[in-house]
Structure formats: structure tokens, C-alpha cells
Design a protein with these regions (language model features):
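A cytosolic small-molecule/anion-sensing beta-strand core signal
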Residues: 91, 107, 126
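Ligand-binding loop in jelly-roll beta-barrel domains
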Residues: 116-140
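Bacterial N-terminal signal peptides
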Residues: 11-22
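Glycine- and acidic-residue-biased ligand/ion/polar-headgroup-sensing regions
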Residues: 83-95, 100
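Short acidic-glycine-tyrosine-enriched beta hairpin
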Residues: 102-116
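A short, N-terminal "cap"/entry segment at the start of jelly-roll beta-barrel domains
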Residues: 24-63, 143
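Bacterial N-terminal signal peptides that target proteins for export
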Residues: 1-12
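Conserved short histidine dyad/triad with adjacent acidic residue
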Residues: 65-81
Length: 143
């Protein structure tokens, strides 16, 4: 059985156009946000949050956000919850992290996952930095 498909130029161009839409949408997200496709830490200012915490909003678009949080020893990420899904990486330091009713001590190289609307918090046992990823982005952080 031989199968043959002949396309004229306008049909072919239409197929290419619709196939490219996801690519166009992805590029629009990058332009709609803070525009940081390359993140240079030294170019981003710290925001003092008080209580021994400061934050850098590294980059974001409507679908995700990366934030760096510096904790002094004894700093507390007050227990809270939000609709955003969160993944965090311990860049340095030691933290006691509570997610729901579970508690774990985490150090450099460790990480954790927080589902939407689950109560969570952290206590810094040794000064350090957490890298947080949120989806969707935390609009409350940029207002």
C-alpha cells in the first residue's frame, strides 16, 4: 500500500504557523515578565524582609518564579500556606523545615517539595540560603 500526501503552499504554511504557536507563546512569557533569561546574581538587589531574612527575586514569568532567600542564624520563615506549588534547594546553611505535620533538618545540597495549600515554614539553625521555585509565579512578591 502506497500513501502519498500532497500539500499546496498555503496549507503547508498554515501547518507551520500553527506548529510554531507554542514557541511564540513561550517567547511572549519571557517578554511579559522581568525579562531575565540570564540571571546575574550581583545585578539583583536584596530586599530586607526583617527578622534576619532578605530576598532576591531572581527571575519569573507568569508560570514560574525563582527566589533566593538569605537567612541569618535564628531567622524564621513563619508558617504559612499559599496556592503555589513550591520546590526549594538548600544552597548553604542548615534549616529545620516543617511541611504539614512533618519536620526535617536539611543542609547544603538538600531540598524539599511543598504541594499547593499545605502549611509550611523553616527555622534557620546555621546561617544560609534557600533557592525557592514557585509555580505559578508569586504575584504578591512583585507588587
Amino acid at each position: 500500500m502506497k500513501f502519498s500526501l500532497k500539500l499546496n503552499r498555503s496549507v503547508f504554511c498554515g501547518i507551520l504557523f500553527f506548529a510554531a504557536i507554542p514557541s511564540f507563546a513561550q517567547n511572549e512569557h519571557a517578554k511579559a515578565a522581568n525579562g531575565k533569561q540570564f540571571i546575574v546574581d550581583s545585578e539583583i538587589p536584596w530586599q530586607d524582609l526583617g527578622g534576619g531574612l532578605k530576598r532576591k527575586i531572581m527571575s519569573y514569568d507568569p508560570t514560574m518564579m525563582m527566589v533566593k532567600i538569605d537567612f541569618q542564624k535564628g531567622g524564621i520563615g513563619t508558617p504559612h500556606k499559599h496556592v503555589h506549588t513550591q520546590m526549594s534547594y538548600v544552597e548553604s546553611g542548615i534549616f529545620e523545615v516543617t511541611i504539614g505535620d512533618k519536620k526535617q533538618t536539611l543542609k547544603k545540597g538538600d531540598g524539599y517539595y511543598i504541594p499547593s495549600n499545605i502549611m509550611h515554614g523553616a527555622v534557620c539553625l546555621e546561617a544560609g540560603v534557600l533557592i525557592d521555585m514557585f509555580t505559578p509565579m508569586r504575584e504578591d512578591f512583585v507588587k
